[in-house]
């Protein structure tokens, strides 16, 4: 499959709406599995604000001619790439999209001089934790957010 990685501009309301729908669908899908950390949905206003301060990516699959996933990235104060709001629509899970998105993130990190990619994952999201482990991420700690506990993971880039 060939993906197009679109960096979303804060004035691109159409793309922001697509991201909102992807995050909402993923949140509902997680809730069906007993994982409620993405309910309520992330707002359009919050996504727009993120587009001003982070690299917000919308992924279009050229083969199926649909938007399949989204994620956000920024270089944190330690000089590492921090990724968040990583979501692939449920109907596209298991097709390698997540792995290809991680490779895009790794390339972006290297281009920006980062030595690590960092992320936080809901501690009960066993599927996501296993996915990140499979792709070379290791747990380095835990933290408490406002509503739940998160596992801090990182991947060192060679």
Regions inferred by a protein language model and the residue ranges of each:
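Acetyl-CoA-dependent GNAT
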Residues: 5, 10-91, 102-104, 108, ...
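Active-site acidic-Proline motif in GNAT/NAT acetyltransferases
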Residues: 89-91, 95, 123-124
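Short glycine-rich hinge loops at helix-strand junctions in the catalytic core
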Residues: 96, 113, 136
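Residues forming the Rossmann-fold NAD(P)(H) cofactor-binding site
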Residues: 99
């Amino acid at each position: 499959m060939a993906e197009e990685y679109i960096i979303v501009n804060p004035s691109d309301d159409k793309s922001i709406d697509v991201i909102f729908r992807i995050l909402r669908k993923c949140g509902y899908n997680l809730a069906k599995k007993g994982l409620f950390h993405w309910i309520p949905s992330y707002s359009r206003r919050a996504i727009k604000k993120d587009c001003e301060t982070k690299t917000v990516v919308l992924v279009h699959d050229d083969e199926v001619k649909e938007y399949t996933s989204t994620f956000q990235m920024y270089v944190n104060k330690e000089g590492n790439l921090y990724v968040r709001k990583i979501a692939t629509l449920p109907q596209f899970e298991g097709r390698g999209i997540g792995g290809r998105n991680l490779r895009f993130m790794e390339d972006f990190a290297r281009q920006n001089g980062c030595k690590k990619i960092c992320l936080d994952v809901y501690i009960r999201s066993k599927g996501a934790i296993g996915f990140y482990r499979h792709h070379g991420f290791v747990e380095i700690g835990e933290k408490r957010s406002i509503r739940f506990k998160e596992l801090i993971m990182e991947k060192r880039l060679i």
